[in-house]
């Protein structure tokens, strides 16, 4: 019997998280001492473990009349006292828990990131915390915010929003602030806005950095600014909220029926932080879907992480996505407390009144439950495919770029989460075409040109450096439910030394400890397959390949997956590429009911045309025509 997401369930999880966090605090109450992989920001305890918990505490204490006391397993935790203690100790230069001195003027410093939510949480809780502070405590807090709110040389990415929220919240508190800085950041947003709700995370449009920062910085910080300072510029507020509303139209399509997210990009250690934007959008009437759909999305997404061990036994958040997933999901900047950016979800959730209709609305199905869909997003260069039969979602990426394992795969699928760990310093070839000289393994680097289009195709040109040469690859992908076709035209650099080979992985089939995947293949028919837990991945060669690899852990490393503790990867190979070599294969990611021997028969013809276009004809007679790529990538 299906269990709807309730306020009681949310409160129980919140109480567990508060208890785990409170038990991790140092003696000052301004830093956390947690297990994990520490970095430089953990020296003396993680300040981020406290500053980021302020998202949740600020939301919880923002509602008048709500008790500050949270109870978990017989213990009581006074969240107002914990918040005040953190703010006082963290901003007192004489405290051992002090959050740090000022950087060089204008430098980008991690504490500038934290200053936004420190200021915003103080504004949210002004009646309980700010007004109860002594003059000296308020002076220390404002001085700390000012130290980390000085003008930088330029606005270079989403960090601009941290400066803006710092100053806007101080303005709302009646403290000193810089209106020119706030206005400058709001103007910066126009320079990186690409339309349809999407922001390019760079100093200007055209760098093609699209990922979850659209949710957990651009959208959330615009929504935060709208709450504390939006009334001062109502026209600008409404314009920015309309952009959020456009972005929110897309959001539900990235979630599977079971609440899984098509994980992709950096900072995935922040986990369910992505729920903050839709919840605040709902609060500010910028959520364009039903309240019931939002309730289902929030509940299922939180459960997905909890059910997979993202919250440890002691009630603290892990840096990995799940209990078994690779810790290599974390970037070097992710300290032990950095994961508490996830508290954005609870900050937005608890900003809703206890009697909000959100808690009583009848849950409504997510798009992946309603029917099959293909959504094309030209701005980030994505195609998102949902399959009702399995409830799974696949995100195909042609245009966005950054770290190779987290951005360079062809597809990021809820049914087959990507391998994030590196083997011998190189990404696993799952959902990648990798050139190799026998020593080095290439991967998709900078995308030279890309385009996506209806009814769900992608085309991209990129380079790989292998064997002393820079080789060019033109890849076309056409999607059709759980199956997609990949076609590559590889042009080798004539100056390269020695032969160049290929390995191309399907997608990794992840499985939990104790499970045993079924593995099969047919070298003559040209397919390989693996299945476990009701899921399957398969790859079949149509043209250009001369070998294949039975599904196994890449280089014997079965600890590379972002979600699962184990995986296997079926792959195709080419022993030696010709100067211009064309490759075509078909990949299945989804339910285990697939018959791999029938995959190749789904395609009647797939070929490049004289004008540079690519034509695919499926066996049912339907066809897809993909136009040639431009020689240079136009600004988006």
Q: Which ranges hold each PLM region?
A:
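Low-complexity, Ser/Thr/Pro/Gly-enriched N-terminal "stalk/linker" regions
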Residues: 1-49, 81-86
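Aromatic-lined, polymer-binding surfaces characteristic
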Residues: 43-47, 55-64, 76-279
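Short, surface-exposed loop/turn motifs at beta-strand boundaries within globular domains
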Residues: 46-48, 376-378, 481-483
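Long, charge-dense tracts
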Residues: 69-72
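Carbohydrate-active enzyme catalytic cores, enriched for enzymes
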Residues: 90-101, 141, 146, 256-263, ...
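Low-complexity, glycine/alanine/valine/leucine- and proline-rich hydrophobic stretches
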Residues: 367-452
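Extended repeat-based interaction scaffolds and adjacent low-complexity, acidic/S/T/P-biased segments
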Residues: 425-636
